[in-house]
Amino acid sequence: MGEEVQQVKNDAPVKVDEGPKRFVEKGPHVVLDTKTNVFWLKKDSWQDKGKFSNWHEAVEYSDRKNLRQIGGFDDWRLPFFDEIKTLYDESHDNPGKGGVILHVDPVFPEGAFKVTWLAGDTSTRRPRYDFSEGKEVYVDEYSFGAVRCCRKAPVQKVATRPKRK
């Protein structure tokens, strides 16, 4: 999606703004999904560190992001399935590590790993989400993967005046 292109008389493309964007960059490291009100790290752990991680290392990675207060936040975590699946969009072809096509918005930089660890505790098999196929898979917790940390934005309260008596 993004911007549509219209043709004018001289066949020069003219960009037409479609209005507010769903994904908004909030500084150099953070993206806000305005549809779900979830903040995401722009880069996954593979892009950030250049190495794969098992599930336990993915949890440690999110803990380190909290210690460093990336984006000014200290509540980064592994995403839940219902959160991560909202990033999948077949209309986007974003080249991932090794040239694998990932179906995520181009606001996320190219080169991410195709699977990301998810929150979940099911014995020794842990959930991952595959951005090339749009599905959740369960694998051994010591398998290779990456993580794209997230956090939920707090609900904004509308300021109201106290009632007069």
What does each model-found stretch correspond to?
Residues 48, 84, 155:
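Surface-exposed, flexible loop/turn segments at secondary-structure boundaries
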Residues 1-71, 75-76, 146, 150, ...:
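Extracellular adhesion/carbohydrate-recognition regions
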Residues 54, 59-75, 81-133:
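An exposed tryptophan-centered "aromatic clamp" motif
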Residues 126-164:
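Disulfide-stabilized extracellular recognition modules
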Residues 29-32, 109, 141:
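Generic detector of ordered secondary-structure context
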Residues 44, 82, 121, 151-153:
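Short, flexible loop/turn elements at secondary-structure junctions
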Residues 3-6, 12-14, 22, 99-105, ...:
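Residue-level marker of intrinsically disordered, low-complexity segments enriched
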